[in-house]
Design a protein with these regions (language model features):
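Catalytic domains of cell-wall/extracellular-matrix polysaccharide-remodeling enzymes
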Residues: 208-286
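Substrate-binding cleft of extracellular glycoside hydrolase catalytic domains
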Residues: 113-243
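Functionally critical loop-and-helix segments that line ligand-binding/catalytic clefts
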Residues: 90-125, 133, 257, 264-328
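Non-Sec secretion/translocation targeting segments of pathogen effectors
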Residues: 1-4
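Surface-exposed patches in mature extracellular/periplasmic domains of secreted proteins
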Residues: 35-42, 66-69, 175-179, 204-211, ...
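Extracytoplasmic/secreted envelope proteins and their assembly/folding machinery
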Residues: 17-24, 51-58, 74, 78, ...
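Sec/Tat-exported extracytoplasmic proteins
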Residues: 27-35, 58-65, 81-85, 139, ...
Length: 328
């Protein structure tokens, strides 16, 4: 049976008109998929909703808030959800009493540290000596380490001792694989190589970050067509899903646009965006236009206590809750 779409109303008085219009465009596709009409209202308050509707709105607010963080603003958010069915005043009161508590609790939990930005590093054999406790003491919350590249090229610095040291220092740790699809190998074989080397080092524990597919410029030699490259990435993602029960994080940047044709399909994976620019609104591939990036790698020439020389630095908007959503 068809249902009348619910109405979602948002108040964001601290945003400019152009920001609001940009948010409206970004949210449209997502809310249409949920059959929820949305608009910016001059005022709004909470009328009551089912648990399911509250869940949907919290998801929408999460997207909106992450967009707001990119603009450096914190919007004031108010919600009105109306149901089309006719109810008596007593029924409405009962609905509001129960569901408003659920909604407010979820909203408080979702945004308790949403304005915070966490930082982290990623390393490889280019950083042969790392004092992980110094990295943690410098304020970083997470760290990624390269494990493998293609097949037959393990990272020479990655191993059991370093993998354990990352965790022992109190960092949320993650591992990444540098893809070599132009070599013509089955993506399943690269997943096998990646996870085999990771398992030799102790494997993934509960609370580690999801594994990462690093897909970026791999030179002209043997370059695949955009369609074949995307198909290869899809095969890698599906094999990780089959092996671990989780979608990996995808690390990419302008490569997704320039050498993959900027496809719309993000393979249902979070984005770790590489954008070494000072622009507060870096290019985000079209496939993630409605979610934006989860992690931003903003420089490959950063500095960090405990590491000699340059190191990649990353920002993760949304605080601890956003970090937790990327963990296995």
């Amino acid at each position: 049976m068809a249902t009348t779409p619910r109405t979602f109303q948002l108040v964001a008085p601290h945003l400019t008109g152009e920001d609001i219009r940009a948010f409206q465009r970004d949210l449209s596709a997502r809310f249409e998929a949920w059959d929820i009409n949305h608009r910016v209202a001059d005022d709004g308050d909470y009328d009551g909703a089912t648990r399911d509707a509250a869940e949907q709105v919290c998801k929408g607010l999460g997207i909106l808030h992450e967009k707001a963080m990119e603009h450096g603003v914190t919007p004031e958010l108010r919600i009105r959800i109306r149901h089309p069915e006719q109810r008596t005043p007593q029924e409405v009161a009962r609905s509001e009493s129960a569901s408003a508590k659920v909604f407010r609790a979820k909203l408080r939990e979702r945004f308790k540290d949403a304005g915070k930005t966490l930082t982290g590093i990623d390393v490889s054999n280019h950083q042969p000596n790392v004092d992980w406790h110094a990295v943690k003491a410098a304020g970083h919350s997470f760290a990624f380490h390269k494990v493998s590249e293609g097949i037959g090229s393990p990272d020479r610095e990655f191993g059991r001792a370093r993998w354990k040291a990352m965790r022992d220092a109190g960092l949320v740790r993650g591992a990444y694989h540098f893809a070599r699809p132009q070599k013509g190998r089955d993506p399943k074989a690269e997943v096998h190589e990646f996870l085999r080397l990771l398992e030799q080092a102790g494997g993934l524990d509960d609370g580690d970050l999801r594994p990462v597919l690093d897909i970026e410029d791999f030179g002209q030699a043997g370059r695949l067509t955009p369609e074949k490259t995307h198909a290869w990435a899809h095969g890698f993602v599906e094999e990780v899903q089959a092996r671990l029960g989780k979608r990996p994080i995808i690390y990419t940047g302008a490569f997704w646009r320039d050498q993959m044709g900027n496809p719309d399909d993000n393979l249902d994976c979070p984005l770790w965006l590489a954008a070494f620019v000072k622009d507060p609104k870096p290019f985000v591939p079209r496939a993630w236009a409605h979610e934006s990036f989860s992690i931003l790698q903003h420089t490959d020439k950063g500095g960090c206590p405990g590491i000699a020389g340059n190191v990649d630095l990353n920002r993760l908007p949304g605080g601890q809750a956003a970090l937790d959503r990327l963990r296995i």
